[in-house]
């Protein structure tokens, strides 16, 4: 009998993973020069041992200057800036769902936890960060990506040492039905949190 796969067949994963990575690299304008797809399955004494999820890596090559390799310390007056896409009901609980066996949660929860890429938006955010880094004086005090738990993670780590004031009503909303919890915890992609020197806010706004 044909084996039933929970989501995709191995062949579909290999093809779609490669296509997806290449598509994102093309839209972002960055060559995809390395990558891998790793899985494992072994049967012994009528017992099957296998990775529950496929591991995929993709990458390129970049560089950074020594001046920009360490984050600065937040100071009173620094402005918290969020760059990138709007907030949607995307990636909710992504960190939790990715850490348990496939099928543990309902399909609805798992689908909400899946992140959706936006290469064009990532390119826009990248261009701003690169422009600031290539100036004679980098006005970025600290920077943090929006990973697991979205704004909750990113913004709290930016102001961890001193605390800060975040205006939720200024966070860009793409879906007006989002609750407060969904606004601060979603993992909508291609967003970056920055601490900016207060006197440079208008300059950053012009570049963005």
Specify the residue positions occupied by each region the protein language model found.
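Glycine/proline-enriched, intrinsically flexible loops and inter-domain linkers
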Residues: 1-208
